Amino acid sequence: MLKLKHYFKKFWAPILLCVGLLFLQSQSELALPDYMSDIVSVGIQAGGFDSAVNDVLSIETYNHLYVMMDEDDQKEFEDAYRFVESADLDEDTKEKFPQAQKQGIYELKDLDSDEFEDLEDIMVKPMLMVTSIDSMDVNSEEYQKQFGSLPAGMTPYDAIAMMDEATKEQMFSQIDAQMVTMGESTLKIAAGNGVKAEYEKLGCDSATVQNEYILQTGVKMLGVALAGTICAVACGFLASKVGA
């Protein structure tokens, strides 16, 4: 034991470095499946949109989302966005969202991480509801079953806006119960598709957004894999030096 202690004192730095490199290698290997999952779920299934929070919203969609919220959420939603007239849009926004030049848009303000997470929690349910309603064919059996009794000229959003808070709360409770069974991954994909639909509505090239997300995530994945490989090689080299 004393002899081992003597050799350990001589090589303590390389040994500790090997332990650190092995830890980094294991972390990189554990991270790779997450990146692959993001490429499949977000990059492919959700079109590259990984959040329920839109950077921009059309006036119509903003109003539709608004009526799907209770009063507290409406206040936070209002505080998170600002309306920009079409004449005041910057060139990058005009280029990315051509349809915004016809009407103006609501732009997301600069939020800190906590504010963004709170807004995302607020917007998931309304985004799913709006996407579901907007994707329905007005002549379909499902639409007629749910909204066929509405007076002529009244939309589902008009009807929901006329509800009192108690009726809204009852409706939201039923939707919450359905959302619980969907799972976090499914909710994320569905919300991402809602954001994608809104971007396309404003003229954005969603295919470019998707390709950029897949490319960026793929590059990160390759970087993590390369880092893990370097750690493995370096650890093997140091271990051989210590063993020699």
Residue ranges and their predicted role:
Residues 1-32, 38-221, 231-239, 243:
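Membrane-integrated ABC transporters
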